[in-house]
Amino acid sequence: MALPSCLKTGALMSPATGFNFSGSLMKSDSGFAVPTKLQSTRKGDRERLRVQAIFSFPPAFLTRNGRAEKQKQLKQELLEAIEPLERGATASPDDQLRIDQLARKVEAVNPTKEPLKSDLVNGKWELIYTTSASILQAKKPRFLRSITNYQSINVDTLKVQNMETWPFYNSVTGDIKPLNSKKVAVKLQVFKILGFIPIKAPDSARGELEITYVDEELRLSRGDKGNLFILKMFDPTYRIPL
């Protein structure tokens, strides 16, 4: 970081007037006149100490512990906001906007810059919030909606699987193709109705998914249709059957 010019030249600038003072007398707080050169040296020393202090003791958010605490706080705010929304089924447009804003704050502190190169993505994740109407099926009676939805990704085998639970236990498996270190193209292959009746997916069953945040506990993703998906880790050891 470059030092201010006043520290290099010994000339001081009055913060009140913007004028430089050099080679004259300046009034000190004590009421005694102090030679400018001496006062400049003293102020310069104080400024150098201030700069050194900043870099020796950076603000908390710049330290490793500070970043971790900030991530924890932002995640907690997000989780508390989505908790009463039934995975998004009861979210109003204002709720969706607020969740999106909180999600973007979490995404901004993503500790995993290249998710598809990390093992953190692998495993079975439980969907806890989404804006996808096709998943939420909010217009159906509640007893006809899936109680829990899971998504599994295995980066090493390039497989993805979405699963519903009671009452229908439908699932679908597909292939993923990395487009970069965060985004994949998805091609669904086989649906299983009631968990065991296979139906080949149509060729149009394609999309893209970008992983915008992932750690050991939480994953945020955004689809190519603008939907937000928030998931919590359920089973990091789960493998998609080949």
From Swiss-Prot:
Transit peptide: 1-50
Family listed: Belongs to the PAP/fibrillin family.
GO cellular component, one term: cytosol
Designated gene of the protein: PAP4
Compartments (UniProt record): Plastid, Chloroplast thylakoid
Protein name: Probable plastid-lipid-associated protein 4, chloroplastic
Transmembrane intervals: none
Keywords recorded for this protein, A-Z: Chloroplast, Coiled coil, Plastid, Thylakoid, Transit peptide
Coiled coil: 63-87
